[in-house]
Design a protein with these regions (language model features):
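Extended, low-polarity transmembrane helix blocks
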Residues: 2-45, 64-71, 75-153
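Membrane-interface interhelical connector segments
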Residues: 44-64
Length: 153
């Protein structure tokens, strides 16, 4: 039963999944693009409290940084989404948009982890922070995925 059952199960799963394989990266693209856009959209208009918080972390040019973070998140999210669509008509341009947007996500998330969430370790920290820190890591890893892979399926 063991090996034969596993082979049959694998064949069944392969049969079910194979029509959807070409769309699997679209699910990641939609999740990251929408999530990142919404993170930025929630910061606009830029609130003085956000600027003050950035300044309290020792960042010079806190007002400019707040603007760049908010708009960077929105534009990177849009770029992740439209990079795939543009890539259907002009593959090189779509690939560049996707990779640059993924790189922007990486830079923003590294900054967020180091600045905003530096006390939220994976195995220690405030109650509930482990889950939130993992969300930040997932966003960073998805950005890295698109920066490396681009639109290559």
């Amino acid at each position: 039963m063991g090996v034969n059952f596993m082979n049959k199960l694998n064949d069944l799963l392969e049969k079910l999944a194979s029509p959807l394989k070409d769309y699997s990266s679209c699910l990641l693209r939609i999740g990251l693009g929408v999530s990142f856009f919404l993170h930025g959209y929630g910061k606009v208009p830029i609130q003085q409290g956000f600027i003050d918080w950035l300044a309290s972390k020792g960042l010079p040019f806190a007002e400019l940084t707040a603007f760049l973070v908010a708009w960077g998140e929105m534009l990177a999210g849009i770029g992740i989404l439209i990079g795939g669509l543009v890539g259907l008509r002009t593959p090189v341009v779509g690939n560049i948009i996707t990779r640059l947007s993924g790189g922007a996500v990486m830079v923003i998330m590294i900054g967020a982890l180091l600045l905003a969430h530096s006390n939220w370790g994976i195995f220690f920290g405030e109650r509930g922070s482990i889950l939130f820190a993992s969300e930040q890591l997932f966003l960073l890893l998805l950005g890295t995925y698109f920066a490396i892979k681009g639109n290559d399926h």
